[in-house]
Amino acid sequence: MSSRVLTPDVVGIDALVHDHQTVLAKAEGGVVAVFANNAPAFYAVTPARLAELLALEEKLARPGSDVALDDQLYQEPQAAPVAVPMGKFAMYPDWQPDADFIRLAALWGVALRAPVTTEELASFIAYWQAEGKVFHHVQWQQKLARSLQIGRASNGGLPKRDVNTVSEPDSQIPPGFRG
């Protein structure tokens, strides 16, 4: 099992138990990684360093601006959840994948880095509504996962280019060509 140690100071648990004050006093940054059986067990932190970390956490929890935005302007009304039909059904406009869709997609062998966007879902629903085919809910989710995998990989993972922008000439010379 691999692990990452977040401090250069490492000590065995026996040494810490034997003389914890000396170990913590010598620690760079007030933090020591404590190992037990050649594996990281926990971190020992000085009270001063703990106070610094808590102050930093409190500072980061505060908003960066004193301007308060009205939340109701940004919250879209939540639609009432639609019950998933039993058995096979044709695609309908309010269809939604399950809340744990990303996890399910991983189980089906499709690693999705980001959740489905509203645009991707709308495109998927519009296509399959026109097709008129019927599938079970799980099958629809599998089709959505494959569709996202293919759609996102088609451009090397890059977002689609805007067709309305004017292209600019490339001034770089490819490797192997003389300029």
From Swiss-Prot:
Residues 156-179 are annotated as: Disordered. It comes from the Bacteria. The keyword DNA-binding applies. Keywords: DNA replication, DNA-binding, Primosome. Gene3D superfamilies: 1.10.8.1180. GO terms for biological process: DNA replication, synthesis of primer. One of its GO terms (cellular component) is primosome complex. Homooligomerizes. Interacts with PriB. Component of the replication restart primosome. Primosome assembly occurs via a 'hand-off' mechanism. PriA binds to replication forks, subsequently PriB then DnaT bind; DnaT then displaces ssDNA to generate the helicase loading substrate. Involved in the restart of stalled replication forks, which reloads the replicative helicase on sites other than the origin of replication. Can function in multiple replication restart pathways. Displaces ssDNA from a PriB-ssDNA complex. Probably forms a spiral filament on ssDNA. NCBIfam families: PRK02854.1. Belongs to the DnaT family. This is Replication restart protein DnaT. It comes from Escherichia coli O17:K52:H18 (strain UMN026 / ExPEC). The lineage of its organism: Bacteria, Pseudomonadati, Pseudomonadota, Gammaproteobacteria, Enterobacterales. The gene is dnaT.
